[in-house]
Amino acid sequence: MTVIPNVSIDALKNHVGETVRVNAWLTDKSGKGKLQFLKLRDGSGFVQATVFKGDVPEEVFEAARRLSQEQAVRVTGEVRADERAPGGVELAVRDLVPFAANQAEYPITPKEHGIEFLLDHRHLWLRHRRPWAILRVRDCVERAIVEFFHQEGFIRFDAPFFTPNAAEGTTELFEIDLFGEDKAYLSQTGQLHAEAGALAFGKVYTFGPTFRAEKSKTRRHLLEFWMVEPEVAPATHQDNMDLQERLVSFLVRRVLEECAAELAVLGRDVAKLQPAAEGNYPRVTYTEALDIIRRHIAEGDLPPNVQPDVQPVEWGDDLGAPHETILGFHFDRPVIVERYPAAIKAFYMQPDPADPRLALCDDMIAPEGYGEIIGGSERIHDYTLLKARIEGEGLPLSAFDWYLDLRRFGSVPHAGFGMGLERVIAWITGIDHIREAIPFPRMLTRMVP
């Protein structure tokens, strides 16, 4: 008998009728009498293996019967087609070799567990179907981001994690004592350094972890999350919005192409993602967005997760989560809201020449109530105006002197944006909280594991 070694579970469909060897872990088992059903996983997928007492030596059947949940095992068996099975195949076991026995009872049993218990055991929960599916989608999105920007002619540009200054204000910074002499902060964004990169290379993007000391417990916030931040020079506000739409539609298409099995595990309605894959995202001004929100509130036409007493937004106020949710349900695909009041946006955003009260900025709001996934703007390129804005925010000019150099020498209109990776993954996968979209979430009350 020829045995094909080291076959991954996701490749079993290519070996129907053949005998293969699989290295896996036992997720669950059942059966009685002469038949045992073993549910196996190997990271690439899941498969059911059947052990019939008449087909294997007694010691193999007993070894299968004694297996404990999450014990590692090497299984040799024939691949059989079965339309009812996940992946369309199952494994008829001919031999089975357990690895080391577990040292204690595995804590995440097949019964239902609460989210706090599962997060306490996140290092083990990662092995189960739901996080497996979510994090494989994350991997797909990360790979697609890199591919997209490579195709668009960008270079990856690594920004530092330690920074002497704030880009989005000082209230959300993690402060670090540098040997008792100087203060530094964990970076809120790679944007400022990416601007330097754009003026050197034309098109750059940063991609890495970001840290915000937000004392928020909402389903949209983490203390540590990942952002992709492209910067382009020269570029306009219009160019920036076009790039955002191309990126997001590319990511959704790629997930639909590559992650059908993962989305099925999550029960995601892929029809709701199709419009986002097609592009043609609506664009409305901040003022137009307020009108849409007011109309929905006045008519009582509200999404299920928005309270009926929600108040309209006054002009000059930022959109809250309920207002973004209303906008997200008004459209069947992401909507770009542009030209917010400059007073509620960051100091580096270019004023609208047609109305200086406004900034040439935008937010992309995901549908189905997932809220903002992108924030971007054309950057101020005038030295005098940027210097005045920094001073107006009460920020130390000394910390931004290098940033002002970008306007002293070879300044040009340029633009960029930041996209929150976990928010995008939460929307695409249809999960309720972004804590599941990152392997080990860091929140106000959670630093372990």
From Swiss-Prot:
The keyword DNA-binding does not apply. It catalyses: tRNA(Asn) + L-asparagine + ATP = L-asparaginyl-tRNA(Asn) + AMP + diphosphate + H(+). Its EC number is 6.1.1.22. Pfam families: tRNA-synt_2, tRNA_anti-codon. It is found in: Cytoplasm. Keywords: Aminoacyl-tRNA synthetase, ATP-binding, Cytoplasm, Ligase, Nucleotide-binding, Protein biosynthesis. It comes from the Bacteria. It is an enzyme of class 6 (ligase). The keyword Signal does not apply. GO terms for cellular component: cytoplasm. GO terms for molecular function: asparagine-tRNA ligase activity; ATP binding; nucleic acid binding. Coiled coil: none annotated. InterPro entries: Aa-tRNA-synt_II, aa-tRNA-synth_II, aa-tRNA-synth_II/BPL/LPL, Asn-tRNA-ligase, Asp/Asn-tRNA-synth_IIb, NA-bd_OB-fold, NA-bd_OB_tRNA. GO terms for biological process: asparaginyl-tRNA aminoacylation. HAMAP family: Asn_tRNA_synth (MF_00534). Belongs to the class-II aminoacyl-tRNA synthetase family. Homodimer. This is Asparagine--tRNA ligase.
